[in-house]
Amino acid sequence: MSVNSKSSIRAEKLRIKGTVQGVGFRPFVFVLAKSEGLTGTVLNDGRGVEAVVEGPSEALERFRTRLLKELPPLASIESVEAEDIPVEGRQDFVILESRSNSVSTVIPADAAVCEACLKELTDKNNRRYRYPFINCTHCGPRYTITAHLPYDRPQTSMKVFPMCPDCLQEYKDPLDRRFHAQPNACDVCGPHVDLKDKTGAPVSCEDEIAELLRQIQGGKIAAVKGLGGFHLVCDAANAVAVSELRRRKHRPFKPFAVMTLNDLSASRFVRISEKASKELHSPQAPIVLCPKTNDADRLLPGIAPELNRIGIMMPYTPIHWLLFFEAIGRPEDPDWYKKECDLVLVMTSANAGGEPLVIGNDEAVQKLDGIADLFLTHNRDILIRCDDSVMQQRDQDVQLIRRARGFTPVAVRLPYGGPSVIATGPWLKNTACLTKGDHAFLTQHIGDTDRVSNCRTLARAVEHLSEIFEITPKYIACDLHPDFYSTSLAEELADKYDAELVPVQHHHAHIAAVMAEHGLSEPVLGLALDGVGLGTDNKPWGGELLKVTPEGFERLSSIAPIKMPGADKCAREGWRMAAKIFAENGKTDALEKLAKDVNKPSLRLIAAQANAPETTSLGRLFDAAASMFGICHISSYEGEAPVRLQAASEGRRGQNRADLVEVISGHPNFVRLLLALSEYADKRQAAADFQETLAQVLAKKVITVSEKEQIRKVCLSGGCCLNSLLTQRLRKLLEQQELQVYEGLKVPPNDGGVSLGQAWVVLMRLHSTAKE
């Protein structure tokens, strides 16, 4: 563009914040500026990226517009601050070195192999042909290989692999896709794979990937090292191999996730929505639960028994892609990965039940003894264990169930900030949350803290994030329950930092997590539909209607309490609650049948326990219903009974039987409903009617309270909100009355989001107090 007037030339300094370091952002700015004929500089500093651009006003406007629209795959912008500066007649655009005193403020999340790297991986003329650790600034390991900030190679597990001249040249070239790609490597200078037998001894073979695939297709179970840990892998179409994996893992019914080459290949056994497909092929590459086709159980026997969905994932590491490339004969067609492929692999976390994910090579051989027949290891150390993230496909959207690889440590942006908070989360499905300013950083999924190993993982995760983000907390939030490990950890942290300890009620935190995700701090109604959490009255809650304000919460209502003979045992043995309900209502025949079904001659004595604790938990109500309807008496994995009840009802139109629900002192009592539905010959219809009635009764209660409290915003959260049939029906009923409904979508509605809620409760309270 020719410039006729000096006055049309301007200069600006742009301060760009967000995920803009370690993701190819400076080369992106460089190319963008060059294409618009601008001059200036770009550099990283401790606060983000600083760009100085000089040129015609029109070009500057186009540059800013394109800056927001044409981002690199892993980059995201939170804010751009522009400042006019003097025109200096700059002659070129250059990338400057990071300021010596700057520390990168963000570690990007791990990312699935990008399309450019995939093309190179399977191009026999490329120097990285079939190299299992190919990556660039747009993909590859990040969080899981980083020990400390700044995010530079010496701070990662790649520090032991000096780059060869070719890789170093790429690393230094601002126009190269691998410019400052910290894990950059090739077969000459980088990590390599090893194939080992079940004892850890090397397997003699010409090609490790080819031999691994041969053994998997021959029915063997392999442990394969990935980004955040090992997977146990077998042929998903081999019923014998799947059954053997279940036997070895002591996992009789819990569903397995499977990996397939693409949507076309997956369409034989699942139906994938457009939004689910987008997530499957995103840099995060989560597992997505998708509805089964009619052929699914025939094609993949034993993968997801008694369920209507299968968790699927696409290849996301070079090793995954190489297995599928090998399976279809190493084709020369560059679009080979778009073709149908018969290979389907079980990909399940490599760990003994409930233990942390295995990440070390020697650890894998030791801890997976008796489970894996062979091991594919490599010598790039995993520093931070990180499970696969899990989402579920719903009618209109997708919802996170487990937030881990690909999402950690990406921040949740809060409406406002405050003093730093560390929240240590709940007992089950634990995560912790650390805040800095208006950013909330959640740890990866930790799991249940009933095991010492998981407790150690939680403590290390908190320490790691606090070091990375230089967080010194003023407040430590935790659950009300005094006996949780997360509470003990919070007490230790409060002493360590001389910080104030703030206990937060479990369901209050559930609702606050949804508020944090959606940027809410005004009063809301919260419907917490959950398993069990300790209430302020020292009783187990779980079916609560709360009024949540910045100052705190008020319990407005709950479902009527039901008895739990055996207390916490009822979470696994739903028959206990079923027996109690049958016994208290004189259903002798039903009680005797139940005793035979569960092979418990002493069932009458258990049902007669006079001192059984009471709970308002909707989760326990689901457990009771599943047993009373004959769907599931004993859960072999957490949540099995409610999940199977939901699956049983799918495809049936539920009838509203609210006439069978008594309201006692404002609390809906569902016992009469359960008794009536338990007499149905068709248990699938019983399940459908149960959920429809639940939705109708709960919605009616919320609508009534909304009118009284003059609050139009409703947050749904808790473990039961993973039941998409229930929540989507609730949403429809509430929105028909023009209520605004919010759910956890990017942060799990189950206990995986509780730590975020704990932290937001503290920050809301502080903000409210400061305004007074």
Positions of PLM-derived features:
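Intrinsically disordered, low-complexity, mixed-charge
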Residues: 1-194
